[in-house]
């Protein structure tokens, strides 16, 4: 049984009464231990299954690829950023880690789903704060961009934005400023040369975030951005207790729900799942757990040392 299901059962979440999608085909387990902590399951859990990404990619190549974005967003400003280990953006800082492998596999799954349904704009959210949705959003954007696809990461949490700060971008004009402006064309988008994707930061948190999002300007912006990019990843606010995410859900093609092992409880997860249309739920990403074989994973698959 998938470790996702194991974790849900340990938390009693299998009793929520909500039917989950096929986690084996649309979700990923992110083995990421919090700083300075080890998993309570480390001594008893078995090794994680080996993921053969090459086989999955070969299967995916047999399908007809969706139409790529044709208009290069070259008019947007390019920024040099320094991604540090503290940022936890493992697609840059730890590309050979098992955590990065899990994100790459999630990217493979998303591409596979796109062969059977329209999928370009992905909403990443969680039931409550502090479950790691922003970290997942950035890493998903990073692994998708590694395939030379044009990826835009939108910092859609106008109330408590964190992504721009974690990338060291400072106070840049972003989504909030565009929504308040009279501009008719998309702006306040920046290409991050290191990570390889574009980002639209939230900007300065406005007092009327929900009112701005419901003004009609946001849908106008998304209509402009959709043909410019192959993927648009939206890091949204938590589902509870705000209504902001329901606005984003109407403008995106599918939702990834982030849950954190040891943090996410049954009641808020149930309420969060009930707020997502079943047809929109791509899967659940389990965050904050440790694979006991993490340190030895790539040692087994590395070339032998030269003697």
Regions found by a protein language model. Name each.
Residues 1-307:
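P-loop NTP-binding module
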